[in-house]
């Protein structure tokens, strides 16, 4: 197994509009993708992405991230997820209020209820809690047919 590539770092943005403005200032341009920026019901994201040649910076107002969350690229997200679980990680999934819960402890409302894997345009995503308590995101790129 080679060294994983860091794909994305997602930051919490409790004040979504202020977060987008701050990161736009950092990059000197607006996000390459952004939801409407309007407050949305629980479980629906205000989300923005800033892309660089090597890394994506994401902002989310959902409660599933309260500290920066690193996503690594995985060629096969299900295999990588299983490997991490076999080494002591815990699979997480998104529940109704937009937060994360251990699979099997609450109904998963976004993604596969058995694995927590979510498909979004261009990627499959999963989050695990590593044995040391830190969260790690996994991302598998998918072809996009626009």
Residue ranges and their predicted role:
Residues 40-46, 65-66, 100-101, 120-124:
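Short acidic/glycine-enriched loop/turn segments that link adjacent beta-strands
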């Amino acid at each position: 197994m080679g060294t994983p590539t860091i794909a994305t770092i997602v930051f919490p943005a409790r004040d979504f509009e202020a977060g987008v403005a701050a990161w736009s200032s950092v990059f000197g341009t607006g996000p390459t993708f952004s939801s409407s920026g309007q407050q949305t019901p629980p479980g629906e994201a205000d989300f923005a992405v800033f892309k660089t040649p090597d890394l994506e910076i994401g902002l989310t107002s959902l409660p599933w991230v309260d500290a920066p969350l690193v996503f690594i690229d995985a060629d096969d997200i299900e295999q990588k997820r299983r490997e991490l679980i076999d080494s002591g990680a815990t699979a997480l999934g998104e529940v109704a209020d937009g937060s994360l819960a251990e699979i099997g402890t609450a109904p998963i409302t976004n993604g596969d209820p058995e694995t927590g894997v979510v498909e979004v345009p261009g990627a499959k995503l999963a989050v695990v809690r590593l044995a040391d308590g830190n969260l790690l995101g996994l991302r598998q790129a998918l072809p996009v047919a626009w």
